[in-house]
């Protein structure tokens, strides 16, 4: 799939979610005949939820949407990227894994319009842009991702005084 088409589909996917959530009619490009494949770590029940969201995308755009999840996502996505057979859209559960994929040339940078949308609409927008910007295979920073379904699982609380007192 060409980069331009991927960006159109990505933009349409997120715009159709927002449009239907607010009861508005989708007015993006007609994607009839296009197929969008998404791969991620979600299995039941999240997999069914993602497929329901995909059905909204299909209704809005005319495209076909497929989501596949795997309990060995982290290994499989890297194999797929190296083989050149990755899905159109990939849901990375960790920014570090996305950074590794970018460093091997596996991610397509998103446009400045998507970056501006994040800056304008996400609380602490610049922080989200920074977390979504990774060095490509040439070492150039590229804006590559949009965060959604985020949660905090690895927050560490500590006392700076105790930390310093113990020489950490």
Could you say what each language-model-derived stretch is?
Residues 161-168:
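Aromatic-glycine-rich donor-binding/catalytic loop that engages nucleotide-sugar donors
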Residues 55, 59-62, 82, 102-103, ...:
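Sec-exported extracytoplasmic/periplasmic mature domains
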Residues 24-30, 95-158:
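Hinge/lid segment of periplasmic solute-binding proteins
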């Amino acid at each position: 799939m060409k980069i331009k088409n991927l960006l159109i589909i990505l933009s349409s996917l997120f715009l159709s979610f927002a449009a239907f959530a607010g009861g508005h009619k989708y007015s993006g490009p007609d994607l009839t005949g296009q197929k969008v494949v998404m791969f991620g770590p979600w299995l039941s029940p999240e997999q069914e939820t993602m497929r329901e969201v995909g059905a909204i995308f299909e209704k809005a755009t005319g495209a076909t949407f497929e989501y596949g999840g795997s309990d060995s996502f982290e290994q499989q996505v890297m194999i797929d990227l190296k083989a050149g057979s990755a899905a159109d859209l990939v849901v990375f559960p960790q920014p570090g894994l996305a950074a590794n994929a970018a460093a091997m040339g596996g991610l397509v940078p998103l446009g400045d319009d998507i970056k501006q949308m994040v800056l304008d609409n996400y609380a602490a927008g610049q922080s989200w842009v920074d977390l979504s910007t990774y060095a490509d295979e040439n070492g150039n920073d590229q804006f590559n991702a949009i965060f959604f379904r985020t949660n905090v699982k690895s927050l560490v609380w500590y006392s700076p005084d105790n930390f310093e007192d113990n020489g950490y």
